Amino acid sequence: GDILSRIFDKPLAIMSTSSYRADAGTVQGHLDIARYITTPQGEIAGKVLLVDDLADSGHTLKAVIHLLKNNYSPITELRSAVIWTKGLSAFTPDYSVEFLPTNPWIHQPFEGYDNLSPDKLLEKWKV
C-alpha cells in the first residue's frame, strides 16, 4: 500500500489484522481486526483501494471488506488489490499481479522474526 500511495500521490491509511500466528505463521487462527484505521489525512471516504500482499484463504480480505462497507459509509467505491492470489482463495480481488493455481508457500521477508524472542536476539548478537 505504501508504494502505491507514493506513486499515485494518495493518502495511505493502515488497518492492522492478524490471523497467521500459530506454528511460525503457517496455521490460520482467530482473525483479529483493529478497531481503528490510522490515516494522516481526514476520514476514509470516496474511492478506496484495499491493498494486501496475498489472498491466501481469502477470509481476511472478505472480513475487512465487509467491515469497511458496513462501518465507513463515506466510502463510495471499494476495490481490492494483492500481489498474489492463491487458487484456493475464497476471495477474488479486483486486481492481482499473479494468480497461483496451486497452494505454494510464499516466503515473506518477515518470517524470520516469527520464532525470534528478545532472548534469542540477544544470544544471536552477543559479542
Q: Where are the predicted features?
A:
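PRPP-associated nucleotide enzymes
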Residues: G1-V127
